[in-house]
Amino acid sequence: MSTDRQKSFIATIGAKTTLVHFLDVVEGEEAIVYSPSFSGGFFTGRPESRDHSHFLSLRPEPRLTLYFRYTGSAYRIYIRTPGPYFGKCLSIEDGLLGAFPSDGATTFNLIDKRGFIQPIESVNTDRLDIYLQVAGSPGVLHTHRLPDSKFTYFADKNGYPHMFNFTILERNAPYLSSPEEL
């Protein structure tokens, strides 16, 4: 029987025609979204701003490197690309995929083209086309647009499934803090 470490791996992630990265990297600056303030159908003041820099989007370069840590039933996905999000986890907030602290982070299933959970130990290649599904959710991640934002996001909100491309860099990958783990 495989251990959690043996089912864990490090990979870069992309999409069919491009790669995936955080909005502040995509934009080259903070990704601020402005929403007008309305009350009772009337404009009531200055637009409210929200920083969406930590949410994922599409990007041609550089590659985003992730650590997929198996947790017994699904994967917790840690960010391994150097920068402000290193060590954080991919998680869902308000239906959008972004970088968040690891405590209570969302776990994900790898879903194959037939709609089944894909055990990584049965994959013999280092290139993998896969869907990501929030564990316990019926759907898979997809691209999503918010009405008050110019950005494209990844979401768990009932959209057309988005296939991700993984390039596996290392299998049987330990936690950074436990390199001697079996």
Locate the predicted segments by residue:
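Lectin-like carbohydrate-binding module/patch detector with strong preference for beta-trefoil
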Residues: 1-182
